Regions:
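Catalytic domains that recognize anionic headgroups
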Residues: 1-241
Length: 241
């Protein structure tokens, strides 16, 4: 939809299995296949920060007429993909020890499994902070913003459950309760008519993935019949310019 609306769209993948059709017909960089030699790639995978490498150059190669409309970059993380949580973090970013260092989780003490998972969460924090720093560095050029939503949670041994994927009706909250993080630069707030006080007041509001599609369309002012303002979490915090 964003591509059809004229935006320059770029999909960056750092997870095996690809985008499963979601990124068809848009420019895509598959870091799993590239595995560019360096400290951010080892053995058969790369750490998520690799998606920030060469990003300016990748964006510059997108069509100029689309870049003039706006740039949207999707980053598909490896994140906390299990069961080998320990592989998701560089050695220097492991604040929780000891951690489970095998994908056979039943061989580890539960706290070791939790530590390995928590290390992956801490590294995602670092990745998001680095992405926001990159965006802040481009505020004179663009009006940047960031939305982060996890696709699922994870069971770490509670009630003998591991990983995720139980039917929604039976899945515990650990598999269903995920974070949604929004960061808007001042230029983006002004351009979009967003009231920061209104947004902060919504911080504790329960959301679902159903809100994501409509919220992105609203933020980017995409006019389409499929847009539902009732599912746009920013709609009542936005004043038309």
């Amino acid at each position: 939809v964003l591509q059809r609306a004229g935006y320059a769209v770029l999909w960056l993948d750092n997870q095996a299995g690809g985008c499963k059709g979601v990124c068809d017909r848009v420019p895509r960089v598959d870091h799993v296949q590239l595995r560019k030699p360096g400290p951010l790639c080892r053995n058969d995978e790369c750490y998520d920060e690799v998606m920030l490498q060469d990003l300016d150059e990748r964006i510059a190669r997108l069509p100029a007429e689309r870049r003039a409309r706006g740039v949207v970059v999707f980053m598909h993380q490896m994140g906390s993909h299990g069961p080998a949580y320990y592989k998701r973090t560089p050695a220097q970013f492991k604040p929780f020890t000891p951690e489970c260092t095998t994908n056979a989780l039943q061989q580890c003490a539960r706290q070791e499994v939790v530590n390995a998972y928590d290390n992956s969460i801490a590294y995602t924090d670092r990745f998001l902070a680095s992405a926001i720093d990159w965006l802040r560095g481009h505020e004179r050029q663009w009006a940047p913003a960031l939305l982060y939503v996890s696709d699922h949670g994870e069971s770490l041994g509670e009630n003998n459950l591991y990983l995720h994927g139980l039917p929604y009706r039976f899945a515990p909250d650990a598999q269903k309760h995920v974070p949604w993080i929004s960061w808007f630069s001042r230029p983006f707030e002004r351009q979009s008519g967003l009231a920061s006080a209104c947004l902060k007041a919504k911080a504790g509001q329960r959301l679902s993935h159903d809100n994501y599609f409509h919220s992105v369309l609203g933020l980017l002012d995409v006019q389409t019949r499929v847009y539902d303002a009732g599912r746009d979490i920013h709609a009542d915090c936005r004043t038309p310019a």
